[in-house]
Amino acid sequence: FVHFSFMDRTMTTVSIAFVNSLFRVATVAVLFPFIRFLEKMVCAIFKEVVDEEDKDIVEISVLDDRFIAHPTVAIEQAKTVLCSMAHMAQKNLIRSMELLDTFSQEKYDKIQRREDKVDRYEDKLGTYLVKITQQELTSGQNKEVSKLLHTISDFERISDHAVNISQAAAELFNEKLRFSDCAVEDVIMKEIVGNVIDAFEQNKVEYAYKTEPLEELVDIYCDEMKMNHVKRVQKGECTLHQGFIFNDLLTDFERIADHCSNVAVAIIELELNVFDTHEYLINLKKDNGTNFDKYFEEYKEMFPLSQY
């Protein structure tokens, strides 16, 4: 034990502060050369899983109840989180489609984790938006909150169907089966989901108008692919079990397109102050200034079934 002369003295506040500062400076001086080593040691002990999913965790924290008294801020925060949720659903879909081509257990597990996160976002957003509706809102704010409330479940359901696709991919992998027929649906699914997210995120009604023609094309192609697959089963080229899996996949594709259509219709209806969805869809397909036929033919040429 080292004895210093000042230890026999009565310590004042000044001397305590001085010794404390001296100790800290000495500690830094001694440990400074070992900073890199200490950093590596801490990282080795507390391993951090670096994943892009972690970026999303921060975003849900912006739904602070203190903002609810200020609807403009609260609505903007809610939209930010919902856009983040939509992108998570989109990434889940992209990953699940990739699994149909090349299965990866790591990617499969990531899809399941992301789906859990999407569910948490949906619950938190729904509760938060209901609280916002209890405030005095302007007409514009009411419209924006309505759009968010209308679209939450559709984005969540897109992620649900992505999980279904991943599970079908796992089943195909385990049974050493593979489908080549899904190539066209792969590109169309990415197109329709990306299109509707852009429409929602950027408030682009013109993007929303392109969604319904794409949804129509998805339905037509799925029907054709089902018929073609039935013929292969009848010829003995595919098993009945393969047929069930394939039909389930096509159903998921159709449902995803339906949910994209729901989001697009919500955007357009709220923009035009039209709230009869059935009547709107009828008028849309009559091409009353919406360029439905034009977009449909463009997409049909862009994604020809015979090329896949």
Describe each model-derived feature in a short phrase.
Residues 2-19, 23-308:
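Cytosolic, long alpha-helical scaffolding segments
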